[in-house]
UniProtKB/Swiss-Prot annotation:
This is tRNA(Ile2) 2-agmatinylcytidine synthetase TiaS. It is an enzyme of class 6 (ligase). GO terms for molecular function: ATP binding; ligase activity, forming carbon-nitrogen bonds. One of its GO terms (cellular component) is cytoplasm. Keywords: ATP-binding, Cytoplasm, Ligase, Nucleotide-binding, tRNA processing. The lineage of its organism: Archaea, Thermoproteota, Thermoprotei, Desulfurococcales, Desulfurococcaceae. Belongs to the TiaS family.
Length: 464
């Protein structure tokens, strides 16, 4: 397809600043500037917004890294890296931030440029960064193994972000589900002001695209979910199954402040990509996974309404936590010993040991529930009373006693049902697949594809 061209992948992560800015905004600037600098450039995928392990305590704000995939006339990797570094420097200079201030802040940005030949070998980096702990030292060893002729790391931007940068590049090597997100950016002079998005237009957009978009509004609370809330460049973001339906938002959703630019990203958001099958014995702190366990204890209520319950499989036992903000605690409180559930989540350290934080769960089997009471005395018909554990029952009226009588039991209908229990849209994290996406999964991405810059992104305000 690209005779005499070389394919390159640019990965970047942790370019957010606390006061403003985000890695996707940097990527938008980078896309346009690369197109200006290299006339032969062809974009062979939408920029990838790759969400990584949500359990990691030192994760970035949205825990999302970016990969840009291009074909162009062959050049030295260092030439492309230097161009990317200079463009990012220019981006920060536009906002009055010096490069040394970026790398000396609480952020640790990372930037890598990769030749296409080794990308298939980088899939394991993505899987580990998505589901486990991947340390920068391990990534650096891998990079050294690949060789500088295949991958180069920025000397200006070589912080912890190289983990996400390398992992985002590796995503393309894994056949997996994906979605798209259109991010619309605001003018810098409006960063300190409340976002001005017409809610009725969002509801209308949702009503005519709901079969191809998701998480636009939360019906129960009547809350709009597409707007960002921090001091950052994002005005709103809409998520869906294909780019064409997302572009309709630009014509339908009304805003009362300037739009500076927009970009469409292909992403692993809303796919449950991190929920890989695991046994209980394979769980470790900060690992993500999906486990199938039998409940072994009655629910207990912890601080803040958190429901704590124990479960086991053939390999071991684990404590599970269901939190109030996810609204799963109300359903978990109905579980009893013997129930079988499948739970997605991640492991966090507690003072009682590792605890599996449940993000969603399915009830696969319900144990029968009975309410039992002591039998009546066969002589005087008064109900027997229990004398203590292992001591049997006694009639207080006539003195009759029995060690192990048949109890009078009645079947109690369970309040919980078989099926999936998932948080409402307002409580969903980036990677969790919403109910609307079940049955719409994709299993392979057509790659490479040829895209014009105008299909991916557009700048409407020259200040970006």
């Amino acid at each position: 397809m690209y005779e005499n061209f070389c394919i390159y992948h640019i990965g970047l992560d942790d370019f957010d600043l606390l006061s403003y800015g985000c890695t996707t905004h940097v990527a938008t600037y980078l896309l346009h500037s690369l197109a200006k600098r290299f006339s032969s450039i062809v974009f062979i995928d939408y920029p990838n917004l790759v969400r990584l392990n949500p359990s990691i305590p030192w994760k970035t704000r949205g825990n999302g890294a970016i990969a840009i995939r291009i074909a162009m006339e062959c050049t030295d990797l260092n030439n492309l890296l230097e161009a990317a570094e200079d463009i990012i420097d220019e981006y920060y200079e536009k906002y009055g931030v010096r490069t040394k201030d970026v790398v000396s802040s609480d952020r640790e940005p990372g930037l890598v440029v990769v030749r296409n030949g080794i990308v298939n070998d980088m899939g394991s980096l993505y899987i580990t960064a998505l589901t486990d702990v991947l340390l920068p030292e391990i990534v650096k060893k891998k990079i050294d193994k690949y060789g500088r002729e295949n991958i180069v790391v920025s000397k200006r931007y070589c912080g912890r972000g190289i983990v996400g940068a390398a992992a985002s590049v590796g995503w393309i090597a894994i056949d997996s589900d994906y979605t798209y997100e259109l991010l619309v950016y605001r003018s810098e002079k409006f960063y300190s002001l409340d976002r001005c998005v017409n809610e009725e237009s969002v509801k209308y957009f949702d009503s005519i695209t709901k079969d191809r978009t998701f998480n636009n509004i939360d019906v129960d609370s009547n809350r709009i979910l597409i707007t960002s809330h921090g001091r950052d460049p994002i005005l709103y973001g809409v998520r869906g199954e294909d780019p064409e339906v997302l572009l309709k938002a630009l014509d339908i959703i009304r805003v009362c402040e300037p739009i500076s630019s927009w970009t469409i990203f292909r992403t692993n958001q809303a796919t449950d990509a991190h929920a890989i099958d695991r046994s209980v014995s394979s769980l470790r702190v900060y690992r993500t996974g999906k486990i199938r366990v039998t409940i072994s204890s009655k629910p207990s209520i912890g601080m803040g309404g958190t429901v704590i319950i124990n479960g086991f499989d053939a390999t071991g036992s684990i404590t599970l936590a269901f939190f109030r903000p996810s609204y799963l605690n109300r359903y978990a409180s109905m579980l009893i010993p013997g129930d079988v559930i499948e739970a997605n989540g991640h492991v966090k350290p507690w003072n009682i040991g590792p605890v599996f934080h449940v993000e969603k769960f399915s009830v696969l089997k319900l144990a029968p529930l009975y309410r039992c009471k002591a039998p009546r005395c066969p002589y005087c018909r008064k109900r027997l009373t229990k004398m203590g554990r292992g001591k049997g029952y006694k009639c207080d009226k006539c003195g009759y006693s029995v060690i192990n009588p048949d109890l009078e039991c009645e079947y109690i209908e369970r309040k919980i049902r078989l099926g999936l229990y998932i948080p409402p849209p307002r409580a969903l994290k980036h990677l969790i697949k919403p109910i609307e996406r079940y049955g719409k999964e994709k299993y392979r991405h057509r790659y490479p594809i040829e895209l014009k810059l105008s299909q991916i992104t557009k700048i409407l305000e020259t200040s970006i």
